[in-house]
Amino acid sequence: MGKKDKRWVLQRKKDPYYNLAKRKNYRSRATYKLFQLNEKFNIIKEKNVVVDLGCAPGGWLQAARDMTGEEGFIVGIDLQQIKPLPYENVIAVKGDMTDEETLKKIQDILPEKPDVIICDASPNISGVWDVDHTRSLELTTMALMTATKMLKKGGNFVVKVFQGDLFYKYVELVSEYFDKAFTTKPRASREESAEVYVIAKHYNGKKFNMKSKSDIVKLLKPQDELKREESALSLRKNISDEDTGMIIKKIKQLRAKKD
């Protein structure tokens, strides 16, 4: 085990939320983030129907089950196969939240439209701030799109976002579809983490507008060249710092070209 790995293991052992989650048989320390968010904003209530986007390893599914009780209903979706939880009213589906067939499958499972959609998913981290922020926004905007397809009117939405230049543009976009939007960082988030949570309440029923002039929506428009540049960046072990800087600059230029 390398020095970095040893340091990480030691830090984790000292982490009160990691130890508490282990004692309580929760699958992730992130479980306590949702507990704290709900304590502050009253997002999930007893008997609610909840959908968890990017639910692996299942910590938020467990938290949502504790909040909704036996009469609630929770469905999680993730690209990974999730080990089933011992509750009849918690179901995990392997699939892509952007895939219409997967969404149809979830809608068929649900007893009614969800009251709440939650998303604690993270993109693949490159270690380059600009790229990670962009990937986070792409992922969270896809989560917002999914929320507008599934949520019942008046429903709530919770999503994790990485801070960066366009963070408040994302909050503005969320505000187009919800009556209220808040930003917060729960106590269980690590101090050094760039993550922030957006809490959106009372969905107004509007469907996602792909023709929006929002800078955030522009990020979703496909551009093969941008993908190729980001793929090159993911292999940057063999790329010099100077070349990495040039790639980031190119990504910004390509992003600026989008209509």
Curated annotation (Swiss-Prot):
Query: Could you state a single Gene Ontology molecular function term?
Result: rRNA (uridine-2'-O-)-methyltransferase activity
User: Can you list the GO cellular component terms from the UniProt entry?
Assistant: cytoplasm
Q: What is its EC number?
A: 2.1.1.166
Q: Which reaction does it catalyse?
A: uridine(2552) in 23S rRNA + S-adenosyl-L-methionine = 2'-O-methyluridine(2552) in 23S rRNA + S-adenosyl-L-homocysteine + H(+)
Q: Which residues form a coiled coil?
A: none
The principal localisation class reads cytoplasm
Please give the name of this protein. Answer: Ribosomal RNA large subunit methyltransferase E
Gene source species: Methanococcus vannielii (strain ATCC 35089 / DSM 1224 / JCM 13029 / OCM 148 / SB)
Q: What is the gene called?
A: rlmE
